[in-house]
Amino acid sequence: MSHESHHSEGMATSGEVHEIREEEPEIETMHIENSVEGESGRQRTESTASVNSESWQNSDEMMMNMRRAQSLLDQGASCFQIIQQVFPEFDASRFENMSERVHFKVLSDLLERAPTRQKLFTYNSLSDAVDLFRTRKNILVLTGAGVSVSCGIPDFRSKDGIYARLRSEFPNLPDPTAMFDIRYFRDNPAPFYNFAREIFPGQFTPSVSHRFIKQLESSGRLLRNYTQNIDTLEHQTGIKRVVECHGSFSKCTCTSCGNQTDGMEIREDVLAMKVARCKICHGVIKPNIVFFGEDLGREFHRHVTEDKDKVDLIVVIGSSLKVRPVALIPHCVDKNVPQILINRESLPHYNADIELLGNCDDIVRDICYALGGSFAEMIASYDACVERSPSTSRAKRQLITQQEFLNICAQERRDKTPVPEPESSEPSTKRPRMSTTEDMEGNQFQQIQKHTSSEDDDEDNTRNSDEVLREIKHPRLISITDMLNDKKCVAISAYQTVFPGAECSFDMETLKLVHDVPHRNRHESDSSCESCSTVPGSDKSEANPLSRSQSTDDIVYAEIRRKEVFLDLQRCDSCDNDLQYELSDPIDPETFAKRIADMCIE
């Protein structure tokens, strides 16, 4: 379960762009002031600025863009003009008529995107991945919610994840991410405590993926496990070389008097969905989880600084890499360090050398079977003491080629094609049939009517409608998981191997993977997906959401919604719908140039 955090400082005032000239630092400050309609005159600031002054996050490309932006600002350019000149390949036309506040958000997001990583073409296949695990001695593993899903802990951004559920279960939340926003928590901790029991430690058993990481450590291969999760399952597994990037429930702190206690002291309150109170001052107790708006701390940055020059393999397991600064780790190492992604989906903003897509535990199982020895023994030991799903493969899956997969798809379609009725020699009294296309569209329209006529189960109807709409829009798309049984995986491209559980489809025409994007109406937001919304392997330069904003499309959607929906003061005090920008501690664009200056420090 991943949360973003970064240090924020500064204040904003009212709705114009100013330059504040100082003798020091040499780079002048950029000051953008915001005022938002519908807030009863109350001002607030919001920014994507999350680049910490720690040197490991520096990038020549990012620094060059930031300096160019600052230079243009000094010359009197607006944020929109800076976007056009610094990022000419970015289509900014859809933002042109939006507010300066939106322009600043887009500019900040573009400036803080990590540089595009170039794939190493030496490493591509599943067997290449196994060889890397076998030979590398300083493996850095970055884990997200995907490693804990099989333990019964929900992830955040999948279609059935925490954020999707929060929208329906807590309609008063201005945005699902507000539950982990420190300012919202201070004002109203009840929603967090209503939910916290679902992820409170002590209720779950570590997964195969956790034990795999422990086995890497035991065999002397693990450099460090950076986890974005707060479930403490790494400690339960016995992993020593772990950094809990976003904290955990192991300790708690009173928000009033600062008294610290053991996390288990609030167990009863959490399980009873009660707000835990301090025994000394009766203040609200907050678990030592890094909420949005809180700093990760020096220890995290110290470890990354030490590890980035030692690592010889990076493995990302079950993470969307959407929250900084953790998402920047794969981009701070030497360009020749191979990288593997194990996830349900491909990530449009991350070019891994090898992509293994599907349920994390299923993929890890196959890797362990291939490695053999203590890794295969670990799987056998795990299966002996943990109840597994009957569908879980007990042996290494059969790897099939793309052509073999296409043959399976072709056979499936032949089996489903109805046998045509024999033609009658007598003239027909019926009217002429429509064209095949018209007939198909008519049948599809009837299917939509059938699926949308009943409102007994909205969730099922939505899911069924999604499937029908996908068939109408993309009849050439095939669900890979539907075509694979649990005993097979497919090398769908040179560098992508797909296992059961992958949340993607296969385009029979382009022979590429396509991310499953659920249909939504105009009042729903895109909080789903633990990764991408584009075709892996296509040009990924435009989709690079590394901050809490999943994409610039969210900015457009939120700006339109802002004009359509009146938000009361309480809702305005926290996160905007879909934006997922830092709103917790006051921060304004004045900090923008200061961060540039900080990053310039060698």
Curated annotation (Swiss-Prot):
Record-listed E.C. numbers: 2.3.1.286
Protein name: NAD-dependent protein deacetylase sir-2.1
CC per GO annotation: chromosome, telomeric region; nuclear inner membrane; nucleoplasm; nucleus; perinuclear region of cytoplasm; rDNA heterochromatin
Chain positions recorded as Zn(2+) binding sites: 254, 257, 278, 281
Subcellular location: Nucleus
Catalytic activity: N(6)-acetyl-L-lysyl-[protein] + NAD(+) + H2O = 2''-O-acetyl-ADP-D-ribose + nicotinamide + L-lysyl-[protein]
Compositionally biased tracts (Polar residues): 46-57
Keyword Nucleus among UniProt keywords: yes
Family classification: Belongs to the sirtuin family. Class I subfamily.
GO biological process annotation, one example: heterochromatin formation
Keyword line: Metal-binding, NAD, Nucleus, Transferase, Zinc
Main location: nucleus
Gene Ontology molecular functions: histone deacetylase activity, NAD-dependent; histone H4K deacetylase activity; metal ion binding; NAD+ binding; p53 binding; transcription corepressor activity
Location of the region described as Disordered in the Swiss-Prot/TrEMBL record: 25-57, 411-468, 520-551
Cofactor: Zn(2+)
Record function comment: NAD-dependent deacetylase. Required for a reduction of the 'Lys-16' acetylation of histone H4 (H4K16ac) on dosage-compensated X chromosomes in hermaphrodites. Functions upstream of daf-16 in the insulin-like signaling pathway, promoting daf-16 mediated transcriptional activation and increased life-span. May also regulate life-span independently of daf-16 by modulating the transcription of genes involved in the stress response of the endoplasmic reticulum (ER). Acts upstream of the nicotinic acid metabolism pathway, which may be linked to the regulation of longevity.
Domain Deacetylase sirtuin-type: residue ranges: 119-374
Signal peptide start and end residues: none
Top-rank taxon, per record: Eukaryota
Gene that produces this protein: sir-2.1
Binding site for NAD(+): 144-163, 228-231, 318-320, 343-345, 360
SUPFAM superfamilies the record matches: DHS-like NAD/FAD-binding domain
Name of one Pfam family that matches: SIR2
Active-site feature positions: 246 (proton acceptor)
Quaternary context: Interacts with ftt-2 and par-5. Interacts with daf-16 following heat-shock, which causes daf-16 to accumulate in the nucleus. Interaction with daf-16 is promoted by ftt-2.
